[in-house]
Amino acid sequence: MAKITKTFQYGKHTVTLETGEVARQASGAVIVKMDDTVLLVTVVAAKTAREGQDFFPLTVDYQEKFYAGGRIPGSFFKREGRATEKETLISRLIDRPIRPLFPEDYKNEVQIIAMVMSLDPEIDGDIPAMIGASAALSLAGIPFKGPIGAAKVGYNDGQYILNPTVSELKKSQLELVVAGTANAVLMVESEAALLSEEVMLGAVIFGHREMQKVIQVIDSLTAEAGTEPSDWVPPAKNDALVIALKEVIGGRLSDAFHIREKLQRRDAIAAVKDDVIQQLAGRLEVEGWNLAELLKEFGELEYRTMRDALLDTKVRIDGRSLEAVRPITVKVGVLPRVHGSGLFTRGETQAIVVTTLGTARDGQVIDAVTGEYKENFLFHYNFPPYSVGECGRFGVQKRREIGHGRLARRGVLAVMPSLDEFPYTIRVVSEITESNGSSSMASVCGSSLALMDAGVPVKAPVAGIAMGLVKEGERFVVLSDILGDEDHLGDMDFKVAGTSEGVSALQMDIKIEGITEEIMRQALQQAKVGRLHILGEMDKALAAPRAELSDYAPRLLTIKIHPDKIRDVIGKGGSTIQAITKDTGTQIDIQDDGTIVIASVNNAAAREAKRRIEQITSDVEPGRIYEGKVAKIMDFGAFVTILPGKDGLVHVSQISSERVERVGDKLKEGDVVRVKVLEVDKQGRIRLSIKAVEEEVASI
C-alpha cells in the first residue's frame, strides 16, 4: 500500500495521519502528528479466537519513549521499564471508548500499542494516541464499529478551549477528555475547579461536536486505503438452547434478583446456574451444545431479567427507588496512631481511608519524559479480594486500582490547599474493605473525612456518587448510587464528585449508543441531589477540618534566610546542620531560595532548632552586648564566639579597665563572658570589648 497522508486543523494544532510507510506487517498502523508530538500506533488482530476463549482479549499499551523528550532514563538500566502511572492511565483512556464497539461474540485477540516517539512539551500524548488507535483499528479490517473521535476540553473566562496546551491547562478551570462515535458520547474523564453541572455538560457537548472532524478524516483515510470490511460472522443464536434454558430456569432467576443482600443473591443465582448445568448436561452432548454457549445464554437471561424488572416496576434489586441512596454510616478518628482516618460505609460498600502528613522530602519524584518533578499529594487505592468475598492475588497493583485511585484523587484535588498554605506532603490511602458498587466514590467520601480528621485545611467537604442507566428503546431509568450488579448489567457508569458548590470530577463510561443530552442532564441533576444528601450525612460526623493536627503528625516551622547564609547553616561538610538535627531530633529541609522547613513531632524541639538557625544566620550588630564563650587565648587578646560560626577579638586592652599583663591571668578557654561589639569592619572582622560592658554596667 502506498503512503497515504491526511492533514487537518484541530483547535490550534495541525494534526497529520499517515499510513502505508511504517509498521506495514501490523493489521493497522498509523503515525499521528500533533504539531511536534509524534506517535506510532499499531493494531494487530488474531485471525481466529483461541479455543475455549470466553472473553474479549483486548490489550492496550501506551508508552512514552524517553528519547521523545531528548532524555536518557534515570534508572539503573537506562531504558524504559514497566508502565508508569501516567502510561497506565492513558492506556485505560484509549481502552474504555473502543471496547464497547466490538461485537459481544468477538473473541479474537487484539493488541494496540501506542508509542510516543517525539514529544512537544506543550502537547501531551493522550489525544493523539486515542485518535491513532481509532484510525489503526479502522484500517485493520476487523469488526470495529468505529471510528471514534477524541477531544480535550479546557474552560477559562467562560469559554471552552479545544485541545488546550499544557500551559493553558495550568490556568484552566477544567480538564475534560471526551471520546465517542459520530452519534454518541462513549467516555468522559475530567477534573474541574468546582464547576456547575451545566458547564460540565456543555463541555461534553462541545467536545463531541468538535471531534466530528476527526471521525470524518479517519473515514476518508480508510476509504482511500481501500480497507476491506471484516469477514467475521457472529455465531448463530441457538434458539433451541435458549428455550431449554428458560424451561429449566422458570421464575427462579427473577426470584433470585428479589434477594436484597449481595452475597445471598450471588449464591442463589449460582445455585440456579449449577442446577441448570446439571439438568441440561445430558442434552449438551446429544444436541451438540457446548458449556460455554450455555453459560453465555444464561448470562444473557440474567441481563434481561434484571433490566426488564427494573424498567417494568421501577424498583431496584435491593428494594430502593430509582433516586434513593443506600444507608450511610460515617466515623472519623477510627485508627489511634495515624494522622487522620475515616470509615465510610454506604450499603455494602465500605472504605477505611487514612491520611498521613510528611515533609517536602517525602514527596514522590517522578522521572518523566519532559523532566523530573515532585508530587506532593499522593492518593493510593487498594482493592483486596476479600472486599468481594473472594480469594485472589494480594498486594499487586492492577490497572483498575490505579485508575480508581486517580479518579478519587481528582475528586478531592479542587479543595486541597496549596503548598504555600499547608507545606506538607500528603498521602491518602483508601482501603476498600467491602464492595458492592461505587468503591471509588466511597474513597472520595472517606478521603474527605480523613483529610479533615488530620487537620488538612480543605476548602470544603467532598462527596462522590455513581449513577447508572438502563435503557431499552425509548424507555429508560437513571439510577442513583448503583450496585455492582446494576453497573455490570446496566448501560452506563456515571461517577460525579464535588462539594455543595460544584463538580470536581466527572467520569462516564457508556456501553450503548443513543445517550441523549437530556439523559446526561437528568443524570447530573440526580447526582447533585444524591451528592448533597451524602454531604449532609458526612457533616454529622465531621463538618470541617480539625483545628489541631494529630499529636503524632509532624509540626512544621518555616523560616526564611538570605540565600547567601545557607552555607553557614549547612556548615563545613554538613557539620552544622547535622549537629542541629542530631541535638534536637528534628528534620530540616533547606531550599535554594533560603526557605528552611523544620519538622518535628515535638514543638519544643522544633523551636530550639529554629532558635539555633536564627542565631547562625543573624548579623552581628555593633553596639549590642552578647554573651559568648572564650574560644582561643592569644598573646594579644582572646577570641570569643558570640554566635555560631562568628568569633570576635577582645584585644588585651579591652579585657579590663586595669592593666592586663598576661591574657591568661584574666581569661581561660571555655569561660563565658559578656562582650560588647565595638565594630564590624569591611572584611567582617569583629572587635569586642569586655571593658565596655563593665563600664556600661558601672554607669547605671
UniProtKB/Swiss-Prot annotation:
Domain S1 motif: 623-691
Swiss-Prot/TrEMBL cofactor(s): Mg(2+)
Locations listed in the record: Cytoplasm
E.C. numbers: 2.7.7.8
Source taxon at top rank: Bacteria
InterPro entries attached to this UniProt entry: ExoRNase_PH_dom1, ExoRNase_PH_dom2, ExoRNase_PH_dom2_sf, KH_dom, KH_dom_type_1, KH_dom_type_1_sf, NA-bd_OB-fold, PNPase
Top EC category: transferase
Family membership: Belongs to the polyribonucleotide nucleotidyltransferase family.
Protein name: Polyribonucleotide nucleotidyltransferase
Native species: Xylella fastidiosa (strain M12)
Name of encoding gene: pnp
